[in-house]
């Protein structure tokens, strides 16, 4: 559409799309993910996990409770990847996939094994969950804690299977696109990738912290122009990990260059009043 309206060679260099689309385009063009790879959605994730758990796929899809339990494992897989990639804590997509009960039980486990609960310990637990689960056979182990840990280790097993299945079949979900792009743009070879001196982001309140970090990473450090467009009222609904704190951060960053639009020019007044 841009090329059909702007007859300039520079039009070919303009990218228009959401953050996920940019990440997908970037990862394929830079051969960070193989050309034969496929992008999967939530339904595909349910299909993968229902096969592993030997549950009827349609039954899972139509059951909100089962869907939530499945996606808690998908989210845990992303959490594990981010932990292994040393992503800053504030950029984690699903920090709440590790519940307060999980933390309490893991602290108890570490106390029994005389080790400290840290990020590196968590990575080791994720990589060797079956070995750690053997500790639950100790008859002196607290029953309540053992029950919590069995539930946790089951989720870890499912999350690890999901990650392994994707790797073996060259599959990537939408969160993989974000995490891999962030890794690439924060790696030692980041200067080899294209950066943009002019960036415009619409619906910025819908961006989560990782998406915003990607926008920052692809923007040139010098002589840049960045425009953020958003609706503060919509931000209160916290969509897809986005929070009001995103706009608060941008307010501080853009202090002195913030403009409020109060007139709606996209709809007639009688429609707005309905």
Q: What residues fall within each predicted segment?
A:
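Non-catalytic, well-ordered alpha-helical scaffold segments
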Residues: 17-24, 47, 70-81, 100-104, ...
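Short, glycine/charged-enriched secondary-structure capping and boundary segments
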Residues: 2-5, 29-33, 213-216, 241-245, ...
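Inter-lobe coupling/hinge region of RecA-like P-loop helicase motors
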Residues: 35-38, 256-263
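Conserved P-loop NTPase-based nucleic-acid remodeling module centered on helicase motor cores
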Residues: 2-101, 248
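Conserved helicase NTPase motor core
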Residues: 15, 44-45, 140-249, 263-267, ...
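Conserved ATP-driven helicase/translocase motor core recognized via long
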Residues: 57, 78-157, 161, 165
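ATPase/helicase motor core of nucleic-acid motors
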Residues: 21, 224, 252-253
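Helix-loop-helix "sensor" segment of P-loop NTPases
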Residues: 254-255, 272
């Amino acid at each position: 559409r841009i090329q059909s309206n702007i007859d300039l060679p520079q039009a070919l260099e303009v990218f228009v799309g959401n953050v996920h689309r940019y990440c997908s385009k970037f990862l394929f063009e830079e051969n960070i993910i193989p050309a034969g790879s496929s992008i999967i959605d939530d339904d595909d994730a349910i299909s993968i996990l229902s096969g592993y758990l030997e549950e009827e796929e349609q039954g899972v899809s139509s059951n909100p409770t089962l869907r939530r339990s499945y996606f808690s494992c998908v989210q845990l897989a992303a959490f594990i990847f981010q932990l292994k990639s040393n992503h800053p804590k504030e950029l984690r997509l699903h920090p709440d996939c590790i519940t307060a009960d999980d933390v309490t039980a893991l602290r108890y486990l570490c106390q029994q094994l005389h080790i400290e609960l840290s990020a590196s310990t968590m990575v080791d637990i994720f990589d060797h969950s079956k070995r750690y689960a053997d500790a639950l056979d100790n008859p002196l182990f607290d029953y309540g804690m053992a029950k919590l840990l069995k539930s946790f280790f089951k989720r870890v097993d499912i999350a690890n299977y999901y990650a392994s299945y994707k790797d073996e079949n060259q599959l990537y979900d939408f969160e993989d696109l974000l995490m891999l792009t962030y890794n690439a743009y924060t790696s030692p070879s980041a200067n080899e990738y294209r950066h943009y001196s002019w960036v415009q982001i619409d619906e910025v309140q819908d961006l989560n912290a990782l998406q915003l970090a990607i926008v920052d990473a692809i923007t040139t450090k010098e002589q840049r122009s960045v425009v953020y467009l958003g609706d503060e009222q919509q931000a209160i609904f916290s969509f897809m990990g986005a929070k009001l704190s995103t706009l608060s951060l941008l307010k501080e960053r853009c202090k002195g260059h913030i403009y409020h639009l109060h007139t709606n020019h996209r709809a007639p007044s009688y429609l707005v009043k309905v």
